[in-house]
Amino acid sequence: MNPPDIQAALNPVIDAFEALGIVYCVGGSVGSSVYGIPRTTVDIDLVADLQKAKVNSLCKLLQETYYIDASVIEQAIQRRSSFNLIHLPTMIKIDVFAVKSRSFDQESFRRMRRERLEDSVKGREYYLASPEDIILNKLEWYRHGGEVSERQIIDHPWVQRM
């Protein structure tokens, strides 16, 4: 994915989240690329503090340009898991993770910061997970994946240098 496609897929979701007062942060490889060495990625990861009462409004705002399923979102909120959005013009997948109730996740939300995805004075700012939280999340995903995925561990040294 290239930065213009990432922003084309991400901006309407962020616009909808902000219009509905949904707190979010960008993480995963998109987030680690901001703090470290940019690399290709297959999706965009967001963590969001979603409430069931806002699901229908979110769907209405995004249904024209995204594959979005209200029942799947409601299940993700209830289970504190994730759901996918597909940006139809670019076919980019956005994984949205419901914020968990663990202390770490709550603290991570308090440490997020506004950053641009590119080195541009004019670029839009997004809420991003802190470099430290991206490292910890990547290590956690590495552990949950049986410690075999190089994708999670490769980003760590580059983010850590920031």
Please provide the spans of the model-predicted regions.
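Compositionally biased terminal segments of proteins
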Residues: M1-M162
